Amino acid sequence: MKKRFFIGLAVVLAVGLVIWYVSPIRIADADPADVGEIVIFNGNNGKLSRITDADEIEKVMETLHSVRFMRTKLAGAHDGFNLDTAIYLKSGERAGGWNDFVINSADSIKAGAFFYKAAGGTIDYDYIEQLSKERQE
């Protein structure tokens, strides 16, 4: 009886883990109206950018939120990145959840311990990169 219980528990956990791994996610789940600043550190040139204009924030948030991502692999000790992005609320606090990530390309991000690939659509990477260059400190 105990053995069946543990086998059943292991099966349920394994199925749950598979569902979690293959489920697509959306990044930048903060409401654009609540966002006060988007901070981008450009790994290509070492410059920091702060985006505070409401229209620019809304466009960036829309392009980020429009794409769903699937986990592809563990990030491990991967070196290098393009646009390290953090979203801050108007209160000055860092937004929680999927609001701190690295944009590597129009269809690839790193968030937490995983790399993700776009499952539909792409990020307007060129717009975000250009905006980060225009707002460099």
How would you name each of these model-derived features?
Residues 41-45, 88-92, 115:
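Short, flexible beta-strand-to-coil junctions
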Residues 34, 55-56, 102-111:
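Short, solvent-exposed coil/turn segments at beta-strand boundaries
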Residues 69-108:
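Short, structured surface segments that line ligand/substrate-binding pockets
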Residues 1-4:
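Positively charged n-region of N-terminal signal peptides that target proteins for export
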Residues 18-76:
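N-terminal export/targeting and maturation segments
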Residues 113-137:
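C-terminal partner/receptor-binding element of secreted or periplasmic proteins
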Residues 6-23:
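Hydrophobic membrane-insertion alpha-helices, especially the h-region
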Residues 44-50, 112-119:
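Second-shell loop/turn segments in exported
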